[in-house]
Amino acid sequence: MLRFGEVDAVSTTMKLHILSDLHTEFADFVPPETDAETIILAGDIGVGVEGVRWAARHYPARPVIYVPGNHEFYGHDIDMIAELKAAAPENLTVLSDDALVLDGVRFLGSTLWTDFKLHGEGEAWFARERARRCMNDFVRIRHGRQKFRPEDSVVLHEASRTWLVRQLEQVFDGPTVVVTHHLPASKSIAPRYANDPLNPAFASRLEDVIERYQPTLWIHGHTHEPCDYELFRTRVVCNPRGYPGEYGRGGFKPEFTVVV
């Protein structure tokens, strides 16, 4: 586990500036000035290393935590995490099933690919096949010499979930913030998408993990509808900009911050 800072974990408070799904591959974004100590980027900032480079330009001094989304991998191999980390300056940390302790706050970061079991094991095969036909993830991302497949997503999900549970089992004397790109609970699905057949490609059922370990805050992206709610004793938030045609309709707050 990486560690920065030597501040008393119990007395620490930290303001986080939270953004996701900026999709700078379609239109640039100039973030507002913020007094937040730490910047959280929950994926789909830009394609490949361009999102990391964007963050490095706009946040040259303060700590940045960057969790890759699905779009970071478009046109690239699913195993490009080393490239993202190599492109990051010293103040920016890419988390991909990685933990970071920063000034008394523990951050656990994972893309959290889905297992397609949102509606249960019996529906998972149908969910995978719909995603295979309809999701660009399984067209535009490579896995070695093949295309990335829903079955690969399941393997990655299981590895990430196992890693996350092991981290949460470790006692930590301070706030714990989980940052994922994909949705951790069905409650994060916006009401207008409640019956969307592709929801299992966006969200997984980690409600049991949240109930058992109750991290302080869970930040995610992927859906282009903001959310902010309590699940057990965990606050769950998402603050996505979305695609150019969605600007102004979803409730994105460029200045959104949370104190932990």
Question: What are the residue ranges of the model-derived segments?
Answer:
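Short acidic-hydrophobic surface loop/beta-edge motif
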Residues: L2, S96-D103, C227-L231, F256-V258
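N-terminal active-site segment of His-dependent metallophosphoesterases
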Residues: L2-V67, E72-M80, V139-Q146, P150
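Beta-strand-turn-beta hairpins that frame and shape the catalytic cleft
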Residues: S11-H17, A99-G109, E230-R235
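Active-site neighborhood of phospho(di)ester-bond hydrolases with catalytic His/Asp-centered motifs
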Residues: I18-S20, I39-D44, I65-N70, T93-D97, ...
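Active-site environment of divalent metal-dependent phosphoester hydrolases
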Residues: H23-F29, G46-E50, H71-I78, A99-V101, ...
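A basic- and aromatic-enriched beta-loop-alpha substructure that forms the phosphate/nucleotide-
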Residues: I65-N136
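Active-site-proximal loop/helix segment associated with metal-binding centers of metalloenzymes
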Residues: L108-V177, H182-Y193
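Binuclear metal-dependent phosphoesterase catalytic core
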Residues: A190, D196-T216, T223-V260
